[in-house]
């Protein structure tokens, strides 16, 4: 965890050193939410370093990752994918099975693979999950998923807004 992410203690220490103690709750709202196994309250270093440098709240991480695949999967996804994605954008949670063995060729139209990719990529976080002992034999557990943080939510809002702007320019509906 320490090599690819920052724990809350290090983030708050850095905020203090920069005279930004009063921003802790807002930084947490914007950039917290990553979970690595039992490690919670984990932050993306890129977003935190950029925030400390600029002291502006914005979507730093979104501008660096390859979001084109995610955008394609959501935009071209079936009605159920779009409906669940809308719930996520409204701050609700969704339930889905997760496939830890995502295969690129299986992404199109495979709802479970889409949520698995979004989870593995850090766009979603697990809030809770069913334990094998609590579900019928032969079924897979479902996971309660939510958007990771405000930064991710705003990135997706902007992505969808841009789709409509492109469609208006091209005359498509």
What are these regions (language model features)?
Residues 2-6, 173:
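Short, small-residue-biased leader/transition segments that mark boundaries at the very start
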Residues 141-172:
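Short, amphipathic alpha-helical interaction segments positioned at domain boundaries
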Residues 1, 49-59, 66-67, 133-134, ...:
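Short secondary-structure boundary/capping segments
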Residues 42, 125-127, 173:
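A structural signal for short, well-ordered beta-strand segments and their strand-loop junctions
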Residues 5-115:
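Winged-helix-like regulatory helical subdomains adjacent to P-loop NTPase cores
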Residues 93-95, 103-105, 109-112, 129-153:
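Extended, charge-enriched "interface" segments that sit outside catalytic cores
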Residues 119-131:
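A short, conserved structural fragment
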């Amino acid at each position: 965890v320490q090599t690819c992410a920052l724990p809350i203690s290090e983030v708050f220490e850095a905020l203090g050193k920069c005279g930004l103690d009063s921003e802790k709750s807002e930084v947490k709202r914007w950039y917290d939410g990553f979970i690595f196994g039992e490690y919670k309250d984990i932050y993306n270093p890129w977003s935190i370093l950029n925030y400390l440098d600029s002291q502006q709240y914005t979507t730093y991480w979104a501008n660096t990752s390859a979001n084109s695949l995610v955008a394609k999967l959501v935009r071209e996804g079936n009605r159920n994918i779009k409906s669940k994605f809308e719930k996520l954008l409204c701050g609700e949670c969704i339930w889905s099975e997760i496939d830890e063995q995502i295969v690129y060729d299986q992404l199109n139209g495979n709802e479970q693979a889409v949520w698995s990719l979004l989870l593995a990529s850090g766009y979603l976080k697990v809030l809770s999950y069913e334990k094998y002992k609590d579900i019928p034999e032969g079924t897979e557990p479902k996971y309660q998923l939510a958007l990771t943080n405000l930064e991710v939510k705003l990135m997706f809002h902007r992505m969808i807004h841009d789709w409509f702007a492109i469609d208006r320019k091209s005359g498509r509906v």
